[in-house]
């Protein structure tokens, strides 16, 4: 008796093994082909067939290769070129540290932020201090800047803690290195950041900092240990403005990717100090209206530092 079973009535399977045989009906009759051979032939056909795409006619392998070549890589260069702005959570994690140390920066992009103890720390760039310094090469690293001022402080302290007129209370002698901001007033920010990120992750590095002033401009510099520092005009604006000598630039000598990709992050509607010397009495700042400003050294303005982690 002839087999009258129809294909639709056969037991169904959801997977096929390479050795399974499928029926092929053609001019030479009905024959069998293994699933493995059919798959190989199908892929070969797809690989050689050309398709009309927006960038021209290409085979699938050529199109996929072009897509891969143009895709972002997991390295500092590509991650410095993308502003994402994603909330990364409330803690600096071991996974983040591992991604930084590996130099892949997985799931970390400029503009992403952590909210730790009600403080928002935003990623400002990657590997900005890699291989800088006079006696030690820094490896893979991530730069962060708080969105808000951590507190207000003076560049030159007064007994009142407020602006006081006069050349003795408004002096830039010693430039950034000699300022009360760096010698005393950044200590609170440093301790807060060490507590929030862990002292083993906040990098100590070396930078070339201005340490003398003549004729109202920085006139000397030297190497100093750094950890939590005020930003320079170059880091914020991408150029010098009021601090017009090379002593002001240091080793972090380009605009931070955060500010390059999203200038809105420069302008936060509060005044914050920069490290650059404007004159014998003034240091530079970012003004509340967005201007590249400056003011008397005894004014208490915002402390918005940068730091690096790994």
Regions found by a protein language model. Give the residues of each.
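Collagenous Gly-X-Y triple-helix signature in extracellular proteins
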Residues: 70-310
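Fibrous stalk/shaft segments of extracellular and virion attachment machinery
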Residues: 1-73
